[in-house]
Amino acid sequence: MKEKIHPKYNTATNVICACGNTFTVGSTKDNIKVELCAQCHPFYTGEKRMVDTAGRVEKFRQRYGSKT
């Protein structure tokens, strides 16, 4: 492997969820922000709630307008 071309690997990268939960993982990034984690995802919590903030179709309709 070539030397001095690989990114620096951080063993303590903070992952911050939108729900406020934080945990530490290893990554090449300093901080990672996510929308869902195991503490708030409906699959893990058993709650039924809408997760999608804006789907692809809605984004397309906002950008180009609905023809129907």
UniProtKB/Swiss-Prot annotation:
<feature type="binding site">
    <location>
        <position position="17"/>
    </location>
    <ligand>
        <name>Zn(2+)</name>
    </ligand>
</feature>
<dbReference type="GO" id="GO:0005840">
    <property type="term" value="C:ribosome"/>
</dbReference>
<dbReference type="Pfam" id="PF01197">
    <property type="entry name" value="Ribosomal_L31"/>
</dbReference>
<dbReference type="GO" id="GO:0006412">
    <property type="term" value="P:translation"/>
</dbReference>
<dbReference type="GO" id="GO:0019843">
    <property type="term" value="F:rRNA binding"/>
</dbReference>
<feature type="binding site">
    <location>
        <position position="40"/>
    </location>
    <ligand>
        <name>Zn(2+)</name>
    </ligand>
</feature>
<comment type="similarity">
    <text>Belongs to the bacterial ribosomal protein bL31 family. Type A subfamily.</text>
</comment>
<dbReference type="InterPro" id="IPR002150">
    <property type="entry name" value="Ribosomal_bL31"/>
</dbReference>
<keyword id="KW-0699">rRNA-binding</keyword>
<dbReference type="InterPro" id="IPR042105">
    <property type="entry name" value="Ribosomal_bL31_sf"/>
</dbReference>
<feature type="binding site">
    <location>
        <position position="37"/>
    </location>
    <ligand>
        <name>Zn(2+)</name>
    </ligand>
</feature>
<keyword id="KW-0862">Zinc</keyword>
<dbReference type="GO" id="GO:1990904">
    <property type="term" value="C:ribonucleoprotein complex"/>
</dbReference>
<keyword id="KW-0479">Metal-binding</keyword>
<comment type="subunit">
    <text>Part of the 50S ribosomal subunit.</text>
</comment>
<comment type="function">
    <text>Binds the 23S rRNA.</text>
</comment>
<feature type="binding site">
    <location>
        <position position="19"/>
    </location>
    <ligand>
        <name>Zn(2+)</name>
    </ligand>
</feature>
<dbReference type="GO" id="GO:0003735">
    <property type="term" value="F:structural constituent of ribosome"/>
</dbReference>
<protein>
    <recommendedName>
        <fullName>Large ribosomal subunit protein bL31</fullName>
    </recommendedName>
</protein>
<dbReference type="InterPro" id="IPR027491">
    <property type="entry name" value="Ribosomal_bL31_A"/>
</dbReference>
<dbReference type="InterPro" id="IPR034704">
    <property type="entry name" value="Ribosomal_bL28/bL31-like_sf"/>
</dbReference>
<dbReference type="GO" id="GO:0046872">
    <property type="term" value="F:metal ion binding"/>
</dbReference>
<keyword id="KW-0694">RNA-binding</keyword>
<keyword id="KW-0689">Ribosomal protein</keyword>
<keyword id="KW-0687">Ribonucleoprotein</keyword>
